[in-house]
Amino acid sequence: MAYTEMVSVAGLSYKSAKTWVLVEPEPEEPQICVQLFGTKPEQFAFAVNAVQERVGDKLTLIDINMACPARKVITKGEGSALMKEPELAASLVEACVREARVPVTVKIRRGFAAGENTAAEFAARMEQAGAAVVAVHGRTASQLYTGEADWSTIDEVAARVGVPVIGSGDVFSAEDAARMLTETAADAVFIARGTYGNPWVFGDARALALDGVPVPERSALERIEALREHLTLLHETQPFMARGRAFSSWYLKGLPHAAAWRGRVVQCTTYEEFMALLDEAEAELAVGPDADGR
């Protein structure tokens, strides 16, 4: 299932057009989860009703993000800062549950400050408030994404609550996802940074975890073609250049002469230049000794 980007309940309440764009499902998406953040129960209640009306039957879950460690979020008391305010966090869950026609879920971290481990207690309070699922990331907010995620946090939360638990943190591949399901009490797995340059990871993880299907290796040409499609979609929907360069670097990693190609990506200033560069890369790969890119 696809999650939206983090959507500000304040933005929805103020009827910001830029915010509303974030909740619109693509025509080919059968279902989505809308991920909300904020601090005011009344704004969450408004947002849930408004999203339900806007998204309709495609809405499967409402998620409250209590895990984001970004400074611009936590300085407003939002995201992972809510882990310091469990009663306020519970009131947000309750406000959503009262209005929602779909399950309400929460995403949390191991704790807020370095060395804290409050996830299990916090998760139990969110379940009491009505959360139907708890997702937990094995780092504290102060760690951001440094160090290693402590997967034992998943087991601690699962032992404390009776609702499904989703594991998160350091899932960079299909193999990581399968290992988390095997080694922890997680009922499901979030894949976030593991998607960078690897849009196949979701299907690969499902096939590996459920059916034991080995992860296939993608050729350089397959990766170039996927990058082309990704850049085209990005060009059609969002500000392009900064993200286009980042996405290109992820896909090109590990390809023949990757450093040289990444250097040329930085010089691209338009979508058309990106496409021309990919044409050149495909032509070189097709005739070179590493044509299959393996």
Feature names for model-found ranges:
Residues 2-5, 32-36, 62-64, 104-108, ...:
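Hydrophobic faces of well-ordered beta-strands that scaffold small-molecule active sites
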Residues 13, 46, 73, 176-177, ...:
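Short glycine-/acidic-enriched loop or helix-start segments at secondary-structure transitions
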Residues 99, 115-133, 152, 156-167, ...:
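Alpha/beta catalytic cores of nucleotide-metabolism and tRNA/nucleoside-modifying enzymes
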Residues 45-78, 85-163:
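Alpha/beta enzyme core
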Residues 7-9, 37-39, 67-69, 109-113, ...:
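Active-site beta-loop-alpha junctions enriched in small/polar residues
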Residues 1-57:
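Glycine-rich, positively charged N-terminal anion/phosphate-binding segment
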Residues 36, 80-81, 146, 215, ...:
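Pocket-edge positions in alpha/beta enzyme catalytic cores
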